[in-house]
Amino acid sequence: MKNIVVVGAGFAGLWSAVGAARKLDELGVGADEVGITVVNRDSWHAIRVRNYEADLDAVRVPLADVLDPIGVGRVEGEAGAIDLVEKRLAVETANGPVVLPYDGLVLAAGSQLHRPDIPGLRQHAFSIDTHGEAALLEAHIQKLGTTPQGPGARTVLIIGAGLTGIEAACEMPARLAAAGVGDGRGILA
């Protein structure tokens, strides 16, 4: 049996796995001939471009809902060493290490936000790069309406004017108002 292993379940990884499954189905190749496995840190597909939203429930899709019906396997864990000669991928799971043999390997692990070493950035800045970080921002926004504030404390500076930054800037006034921060303002930089 041949094995295709996809590392990462973001858009690139998920579409790679789904596309491979669809193509194999079109060719009449059964799961007993070629297996597809997705390796991901958790059991969710995160729609990162929507992490600016206040309601984060809809920005994560259970991988089981997408992959199980089409016969794609899942391994939850951290991908590690790749043995290019033996064609094996080491994965650290909650139950210990696992080695996955592969005939085809797709590396779609995604990106990670680079946080420069700027004094005060880690203490006073929030990110929406991950679901967890977006949840921390939402918790902070909810506290703003009830916490005594000093000058400038109700100002939100959004750094980055790409799609996500613009979406965050457009949504921020409504989020601040919903949290009781009627005089809050957002600045897009």
Predicted regions span which residues?
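FAD-binding core/adjacent interface of flavoenzyme oxidoreductases
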Residues: 72-155
